[in-house]
Curated annotation (Swiss-Prot):
The lineage of its organism: Eukaryota, Viridiplantae, Streptophyta, Embryophyta, Tracheophyta. GO terms for cellular component: Mon1-Ccz1 complex. Pfam families: Intu_longin_1 (PF19031). This is Vacuolar fusion protein CCZ1 homolog A. It is found in: Endosome; Prevacuolar compartment. One of its GO terms (molecular function) is guanyl-nucleotide exchange factor activity. GO terms for biological process: vesicle-mediated transport.
Length: 515
């Protein structure tokens, strides 16, 4: 991870609405979020004005696909149109001396992830703006949400076996070439034995029946791996990402080697406390000082806010309790992309197994269902099955190196199901820096080809021998991607091709065999 100071020009992150602030004197209205928030308005408008100009200019030549990235001498400008006319832009400083070498698509995936998580909890940004046209409500939700995401979202470090955060002190950690064998925006699946898979399917049916005739959804995780889901691929990725951040046994355990516990420096606490307030540099901070911005802001990504209750269900006070409301008003809720339904989220945990159960909120409001009744049904009907499945999986689990394949350092991505599998982080660290840089550059070439193809599937096969004699390989076919580094210097191109073929046959059902 490359460290970027929050006090200099190394990073700017903003979100703005092209439909707002087009009248002279009202330019500030277009700003929905800006990091660092304490920059003066003129600097914020300068960054957004340049970004807006680049978007407008590139649309002249490519109306259907506007600006994705602009490479300047000192900075990279990464663009992501989160919703129609609502843009997120990340401006990062180039600095090879600090290891700030990244893949643009990896940075764009950070923007996409934070937007997807925000929508899962709060709904679309455009809908919020239409609900409250001044933009005050939208900003009051965006500022703490993105700040919490940046300051506490945990990523498995490739340099050591522990969690690191985007913020370490006042340094912002961005994904670099060292994470090139990882794919944000995908889930990692657990491979099950046949008998265990049958038991899991039976458990899913039991969970579905706990709400009677109502259509529910469920997700099951073992540690940080997905076991089962009844959600769409997009909804699965969003909920899986949140679960790994805050709900799994690893996320809840205070004795794991997480930097959020080991690094309680002033920077971390400063960011946490600051995100409770309207940022000094935001246009809503003026109103908040006068007491006009006092509504309760839900901050789902706050750290250390979930605990396990005596009945096995996870509890949190993030959603609070509405005055005069029912206890159900404190239950977490999320939006599903596929059905546009608002769902209650219940989380149950037994050792390393975490179950997530989603139920439509309108059923609770209408009195068709009660949360307490569903919880009791889960305990009565599913607890023994859960215990047995957790025991079986734990007994057969190979640990953190379960998916290590001797001689290979790899990443496999299925874009249709949004599932990925890769070499364990500890094994990736054995690659030389030159190997990772070569692989990162190869992935950039594939990203460029995919961008030029404009969504059309295109088979690709690239095999390059780098200066340190490492072979880096990319194969893309039928929505699936394989990236690999082979550091056996004596291998010829034919040896390398055969090695990739053996890998494809044994571990990918022959998906990457090329004619």
């Amino acid at each position: 991870m490359a460290s970027m100071s929050s006090g200099d020009e190394s990073l700017r992150l903003c979100m703005f609405d092209l439909r707002r602030g087009q009248t002279e004197g009202q330019e500030l209205e277009k700003i929905l979020f800006f990091y660092p928030a304490d920059l003066d308005f003129s600097t914020q408008l300068s960054v957004i004005g340049l970004s807006e100009g680049l978007i407008t200019f590139t649309r002249l030549f490519s109306p259907e696909a506007a600006c994705e990235v602009i490479e300047a001498e000192r900075h990279s400008h990464v663009f992501y149109e989160a919703e129609p006319d609502i843009w997120m832009v990340m401006v990062v400083e180039k600095n090879k001396e600090t290891g700030a070498i990244w893949r643009i698509d990896a940075l764009r995936r950070v923007l996409k992830e934070v937007h997807s998580l925000f929508v899962m909890f709060h709904g679309s940004i455009r809908a919020l703006i239409e609900k409250e046209p001044t933009g005050g409500l939208t900003r009051s939700l965006l500022y703490p949400f993105i700040t919490d995401y940046l300051s506490t979202f945990q990523i498995w470090s490739l340099s050591e076996d522990c969690c690191c955060e985007f913020f370490v002190g006042k340094k912002l950690q961005l994904p670099t070439f060292r994470e090139t064998l990882r794919e944000r925006g995908t889930v990692q699946m657990l491979t099950l034995a046949r008998d265990t898979a049958v038991e899991v399917q039976s458990l899913v049916q039991v969970l579905d029946s706990c709400a009677g005739s109502l259509r529910c959804h469920s997700m099951i995780l073992f540690q940080d791996l997905l076991v089962s889901t009844t959600l769409s691929a997009d909804d699965t990725v969003d909920l899986f990402t949140f679960a790994v951040m805050r709900l799994t046994s690893k996320a809840l355990s205070s004795d794991t080697s997480s930097w959020s516990y080991l690094r309680k420096g002033p920077g971390s606490s400063e960011i946490s406390s600051r995100s409770n307030l309207a940022p000094v540099g935001s246009i809503d901070s003026l109103h908040s000082r006068n007491g006009n911005n006092m509504h309760h802001v839900i901050r789902p990504l706050q750290n250390d806010k979930w605990t396990k209750g005596k009945d096995g269900f996870l509890i949190t006070d993030i959603w609070g309790l509405e005055t005069g409301g029912s206890p159900d008003s404190a239950i977490p809720t999320i939006w599903l992309q596929q059905t546009q339904e608002r769902m209650y989220l219940l989380a149950y945990q037994h050792k390393s197994l975490t179950l997530l159960l989603l139920m439509p909120t309108n059923a609770i409001v209408n009195g068709d269902l009660s949360i307490s009744a569903v919880k009791q049904q889960v305990i009565e009907d599913a607890s023994l099955r859960i215990l047995k499945i957790e025991e079986n999986i734990s007994r057969g689990w190979g640990g953190e190196n379960a998916y290590h394949i001797k001689g290979y350092r790899y990443l496999v991505v299925d874009n249709d199901t949004k599932v990925s599998r890769s070499s364990p982080s500890g094994k990736v660290t054995t690659l030389a820096k030159e190997s990772l840089l070569a692989l990162n550059k190869l992935r950039e070439e594939v990203d460029s080809e995919k961008s030029r193809a404009k969504g059309q599937e295109k088979d690709m096969e690239i095999c390059i021998r780098a200066k340190n004699n490492v072979w880096v390989i990319a194969r893309v076919t039928r929505g699936k991607e394989l990236y690999m580094a082979l550091e056996k210097g004596s291998d010829t191109l034919l040896d390398t091709t055969d090695a990739v073929g053996r890998f494809s046959n044994r571990y990918c059902s022959g998906a990457f065999l090329m004619d």
